[in-house]
């Protein structure tokens, strides 16, 4: 329809992602029973989506670009499991397409969705092509033709959804990845029309109770901004100051340094933290890092040259890993994968200059690769496929060697290509 002047606002965007969350809320248990995207993929996708939507719950950006960026940042950091990492990249591409926009035309919004699908495709390079990518490509093709025709956004999403439905006959309809991609677009369309059912998170009314047996979405709140600053006040009440900072942070490291007090914390509201700190003395050397983007992380007074970081599903495994020389433990299992943010946060510790990140399940691989993308040379990966292979790798670790040398030796010892 030529001459379409429809405008998509930030409120429209909120409804769409709320609709997608709602659809996953209805479908996640069914998706959990499917194969093709790892263990408990429905739960992981729901928790990833919950982290993304929580970032918008009290956001004040009225513009669609600001909302999209907040959502993408939270999704990348809150991504769990292989499916969650793919979905987070979809959001990241959408945000890229909406950067700097207060509102978007239907065409601009449709192109942003195409960006998102492109980003999702890039994160899964394996052959043969996974069903989630097959569906994504079909959706992108359907959206492309609708965008070229300058159709309203509901018709663009409808065309994309129909293309996805048509492509389902070429893949296993019981594949979890394919169902996830289809469910996402169906939810967006319902949300835009205001037709969604009792989401656990309501962007207009605040948080309400979730389904029985479902993780409380508030526990998936991510704090993806690393704030470091110095305060010139040697007489500061350290405990009172730290307690106030912890109101808006995952942790707060507060240390005296000569006439200054050094602060290092992770938060979802860096502005609030800086505003709090202003009241305690003159600020200088303020640095805010978005940890969901690639960043250089300097080690401040690290105690070790290189450390091992691994994932433990219970206390017994955690003790065994520590006995085998693992220095940092992240809690997680195949049914409850750790988020990218939890892995990155652990590697943000000043314990070591470099880290070797270990995996004992394929379900962790994409999240660890994302951590590597964000942290760069600060970490190296050893991606085993089971606990026995991980144990073989750990026996080759040498604390006197570099992280790069260790990772190479450990992969060779365990037969990891």
How should these model regions be labeled?
Residues 1-417:
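N-terminal loops that bind phosphate or other acidic moieties
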């Amino acid at each position: 329809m030529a001459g379409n002047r429809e405008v998509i606002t930030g409120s429209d965007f909120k409804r769409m992602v709320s609709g997608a969350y709602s659809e996953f809320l209805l479908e996640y248990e069914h998706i959990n029973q499917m194969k093709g995207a790892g263990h408990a993929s429905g739960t992981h996708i729901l928790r990833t989506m919950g982290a993304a939507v929580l970032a918008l719950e009290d956001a004040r950006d009225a513009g669609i670009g600001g909302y999209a960026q907040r959502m993408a940042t939270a999704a990348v950091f809150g991504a769990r499991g292989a499916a969650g990492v793919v979905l987070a990249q979809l959001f990241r591409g959408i945000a890229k397409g909406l950067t700097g926009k207060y509102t978007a035309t239907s065409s601009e919004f449709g192109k942003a969705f195409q960006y998102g699908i492109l980003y999702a495709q890039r994160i899964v390079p394996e052959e043969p092509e996974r069903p989630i990518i097959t569906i994504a490509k079909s959706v992108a093709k359907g959206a492309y033709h609708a965008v070229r025709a300058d159709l309203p956004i509901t018709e663009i999403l409808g065309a994309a959804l129909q293309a996805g439905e048509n492509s389902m006959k070429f893949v296993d309809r019981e594949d979890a990845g394919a169902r996830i991609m289809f469910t996402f677009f169906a939810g967006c369309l319902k949300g835009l029309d205001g037709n969604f059912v009792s989401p656990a998170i309501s962007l207009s009314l605040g948080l309400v109770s979730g389904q029985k047996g479902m993780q409380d979405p508030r526990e998936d709140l991510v704090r993806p901004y690393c704030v470091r600053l110095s305060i010139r006040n040697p007489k500061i009440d350290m405990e009172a100051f730290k307690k106030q900072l912890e109101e808006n942070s995952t942790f707060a490291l507060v240390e005296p340094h000569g006439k200054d007090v050094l602060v290092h914390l992770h938060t979802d509201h860096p502005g609030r933290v800086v505003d709090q700190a202003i009241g305690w003395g003159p600020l200088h050397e303020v640095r805010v890092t978005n940890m969901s983007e690639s960043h250089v992380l300097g080690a401040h007074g690290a105690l070790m040259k290189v450390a091992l970081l691994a994932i433990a599903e219970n206390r017994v495994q955690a003790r065994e890993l520590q006995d085998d020389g693992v220095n940092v433990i992240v809690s997680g299992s195949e049914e409850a994968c750790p988020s990218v943010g939890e892995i990155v946060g652990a590697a943000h510790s000043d314990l070591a200059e470099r880290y070797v990140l270990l995996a004992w399940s394929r379900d962790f691989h994409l999240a660890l690769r994302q951590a590597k993308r964000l942290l760069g040379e600060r970490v190296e990966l050893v991606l085993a496929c089971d606990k026995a292979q991980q144990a073989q790798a750990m026996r080759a670790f040498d604390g006197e060697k570099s992280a790069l040398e260790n990772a190479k030796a450990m992969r060779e010892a365990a037969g990891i290509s």
